[in-house]
Amino acid sequence: MQGCQAGASIFFLIAANPDANHGASGGLGSRWIRTFSRIAPAGTQGMAGPLRSRVEELKRPWWRESSPLVLQHSEAARLAADALLERGEAAYLQVISEERELPFLSALDVDYMISHVRGVPELSEAQGSETLGQDLSMLSEVTSGTYFPMASDLDPPDLDLGWPEVPQATGFSPTQAVVHFQRDKGKSIKDLLRFLFSQAQTVVAVVMDVFTDMELLCDLMEASSRRGVPVYLLLAQEHLKYFLEMCYKMDLNGGHLVNMRVRSTCGDTYCSKAGRRFTGQALEKFVIIDCEQVVAGSYSFTWLCSQAHTSMVLQLRGHIVEDFDREFRCLYAESQPVEGFCSNEDPLMPQVPRPPPVTLAFGPAVPSATGSSPSSNSLSSIKHSPLLARSSYLALPGGGGRNDMGMGSSSPGPAYHEAGGQPSLYRQLSDPNHISPPGPYRANLSKLGASPWSQSSPALNHSSTSPLTLAVGSPLLPSSRPLLHFTRGVPALSRLPENGLPASQDPSLPRGRWVPGTALETVEEKKVSLSQSHDHLDRLSPFSKAGEAGGPNSRVTPDSSSLQHRELALDDRRLSLSHSHSQLDLLSQGQGVLESGSLRPGELSLENRKLSLNHNHGQLDLLPQNPKPQAPKIPSDAYSSAGPSKPSLDDRRQTLGHSQLDLITKFGPFRSEGPGPSCPPEPSPVRMAGVGSADEKRLTLGHSKLDLITKYHQLQGARQKPEPGIPGAPVSGHQNGSSNDLFAPEKRLTLGHSKLDLITKYNKSKFKQLRSRFES
């Protein structure tokens, strides 16, 4: 035993002796040999693998010297993986033991490799061994590690929907990153993605491993079909079945995904020397929005990731977007079409029956050039979507087969595709009773609950009728509304409220009131058109004319006790809205009806000539444009029962926004005379001559105080002193009450007139008044 130990020590000395003259290098070599001899297990020969050696070094805390970082391929790992693919897990463990290496594959890795391994494509026996060897050699030359894009027999798929270039502002700007954690419930990642989808304008590109969130798919469908934004989906082949299951539950196929491309992608392929291979998964997850920003991270498009799983994403801007743009182009070139969702550029895959074309609203479509094939420069791809140039998604709701897809509603349904000759996606698993509702409203029933959108799964529903349809019934179908027309002698329809009360609660108009047809026609003819070039909206009361016309068909009599109440309520509702001025001009249209019997033809024509719209000023004066019908003269006895407390017709008019001086000028001279009748009689010619010409019967707002004071004194003098020379002039309360009729021919409140017109008009009246005062 001692000899063995001495021999061992002598062996080490001999091994280290040739390096004794080399100084420190010899000491390091002998030290490494001693250490390896101590850690080497008994009964083993040769050196341990690199992974085992490094682990043993790191387990000893006293080891001070750090080994250099070696970035090289592990041949032991390659041999073990090939043995696993060719002969199974037992051969893998045997190679690990022989190479003195650690079992580096986990149980998850071993299961994936064994379940996804596939061999070389088998050839027929008639070819013989020579043909087999020749084909294998040619296959080895073609599928070498060198990439020959121009010699490829298959062109990569085109970005046929369009792909914009990276904006220059994005390419030259520095990288900006904002991190979003799923732990922050106030700012969830799903809400961020939905917001970005709603704001996209040029393109949306999604690379995702698992996609089972229905809300996110609806957002992408709305962006593609409603707003015409091209959408590209690259989904992992491993979890593609879950996406197809979601589409089956929603009763979706390729015909519904308008302006959207769905393709599958996978990872790299690992090949052994014997020809066994397996393909990895595509675990990249990022979203490109308009080639301006990228959202990348660990978030998957699943309900659990939005509610339970924790994840994080980075929202990136700047020139880093170009790297993601290049990566997406590479992934899209390597992707494969999805059965049932392939486009016209995939001739090898079964096509989904396309709906009939829709007549374009802006001319024929322009075929787009290819942009991703190697023969044509991939960087100069399509700059806009063909759907943006075409307006097929803007078709009217009954205009063709693509209407439902373009407008984002349900498509013709499963029955449509079955009639076309090819069943829709997973139709062999659907319920045989699942039939689209017949009739011309089949496309519109999706919004009413009869489509599979309102069902959890078509395979679980044994009835083609939606629960919402059973509960509500056929009234949900759109029906044409009959045209309503007025007939003579029918009750008046309820009109819009003018004083804040609906027609049913109006105290002045009972519910059983009948409006004759002639009165309604008169109201319609006398409606004043609203000027859209001004900012005012003057509302006139149409029923005031019908109530005061006093025609033979009207039921309102002069001696009715409710006449004053109705006229007062009608006058109160004559409120015109003015948005650009502080004054509200209220026009009394009923006075002209009561006074038309006493006006001379000359004054009536003069009044009609003043009914013009002043478009040069800021307000819209609405005046009766048709001559008032001659009302029957009402005797003064008819007003004896009205009561002395009833104010005059002008006093009952409510003015808003006028100055206090204007109100005093308007109402002062008549309130001091005491109560008068509610409706004035005919004005006497003496009173008309005593006041002045008809040009001085207009109240103006915004004038100087001198003009208003002068006018006030003129009215006071005309009231207190009758015209001399005509004895026996009646002076009574009726005359006092009829002083409001002095301004009857011209009851329009004018705002914003020029000073020259006002000065000219008032100088004419002042000259006559001042001369008569000085002479007396």
Swiss-Prot record:
GO terms for molecular function: protein kinase binding. It is found in: Cytoplasm. Signal peptide: none annotated. Pfam families: SACK1 (PF07894). Residues 452-467, 554-563 have a biased composition (Polar residues). Residues 1-340 are annotated as: DUF1669. Keywords: Cytoplasm. It comes from the Eukaryota. Its main location: cytoplasm. Residues 523-539 have a biased composition (Basic and acidic residues). Gene3D superfamilies: Endonuclease Chain A. Phosphorylated by CSNK1A1. Residues 368-385 have a biased composition (Low complexity). Residues 344-467, 494-565, 617-653, 669-694, 716-745 are annotated as: Disordered. Belongs to the FAM83 family. PANTHER family: PROTEIN FAM83A-RELATED. May play a role in MAPK signaling. All members of the FAM83 family of proteins share a conserved N-terminal DUF1669 (domain of unknown function 1669) domain of about 300 amino acids. This domain mediates the interaction with casein kinase 1 (CK1) isoforms. Therefore, it has been proposed to rename DUF1669 the polypeptide anchor of CK1 domain. Directly interacts (via DUF1669) with CSNK1A1 and CSNK1A1L. May interact with RAF1. This is Protein FAM83C. It comes from Mus musculus. The lineage of its organism: Eukaryota, Metazoa, Chordata, Craniata, Vertebrata. The gene is Fam83c.
